[in-house]
Amino acid sequence: MKQMQGIGQLLWKLREKEGIRQKQLCMGISSLSKYARIEADQQEIDFFLIDRIMGRLGKSVERLTYILPMDVYKIYELRQEVQQKICQRKWEEAEQYLDEYEKNKRAKEPLHRQFIEQERAQIAWLRGESVELVCEHLETAILQTMPEAENQRKTGVLSAEEYKLLLFRWEVCQETEQKRAKDEIKALVEEIFRKNFEKTERVKIIPYAALLISKVIEEGENTIYIKMRTEEALEALRDEGKLLYMPEILSQYIRILEKEQSNADFIEILRQEQKCILEVEHDYNVSFENYRLFEHVIRNFEVDAELIRRTRRASKLTQESLSEDICTQETLARIENGNQ
């Protein structure tokens, strides 16, 4: 294969290292021909698609810096606003942002449709609306990128976000007459813990998996296994400094230790840790409790207009000199303001 440049070369190397075929990696999110062009650096970059491809490879995008057009940057900002309002339990405002998202020309694309539907499912669940409504939104979200979910699970080529959707479906369905099998969640949890996720991706999903597996393993059946998974989740959360799931994992760990009649002083330390986290959430007027689909991602974005302006100024160039023989000064001004 010829030497490639840019993001395509990175994706090719990562895919080859994991032993994943192109067809497996792009199923449900891109045509095979489009993905092949991406690897060959012959396709315009779709930032949201790159996010998901990297996720399916088990890799984090937190170390990538994107230079974005303003319209793409606004979508990322819109997603953040939706999640912030959900954390603040401001349902109506979150719905308004989702309605705004729906009006975007890209809203019908699978990755965007999935985000909109999963957030509507999350809001409905947190608000205590009908389980049927939650499931309706959730199934629509899943189908966007996992049209063959069972076959895709067999390959293990799913992202943390996609695995969370499958876990959430199992949890929600436990409140209906169509409860999903215990064997399904046991298999899902094993798949998740086996997958070669980077630490920053692993922490997004294994705490949720640890919480759900404790619901299906009966008392005395295999408490050692639950304890092991809970400790792995707690360690991951502490190592990455994440709050999502932390109070619930601490609560689960405390119950396990109490049943074992473990050191009372250590249990009290865990209680105080949990209390402090909940106080921080209260002080900042947010709540992560039961917010299963929150995407806690730290990203570096550069808006292309801002980058042009900053680079021009660093080079001590005027708009007039930079635009000479290229465009009018007025056109460059509009570009730098994000209006061109």
What residue spans do the PLM features occupy?
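DNA major-groove recognition helix of helix-turn-helix/homeodomain DNA-binding modules
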Residues: 48-63, 340
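Short alpha-helical DNA-recognition segment
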Residues: 18-37, 315-333
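Helix-turn-helix/homeodomain-like alpha-helical modules used for DNA recognition
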Residues: 74-127
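"A position-specific structural signal for the A-helix of alpha-solenoid helical repeats
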Residues: 80, 112-123, 161-171, 207-214, ...
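A short, Lys/Arg-rich alpha-helix, primarily the initiator
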Residues: 1-17, 290-314
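Flexible helix-coil transition and linker loops at the boundaries of alpha-helical arrays
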Residues: 66-67, 101-113, 127, 143-160, ...
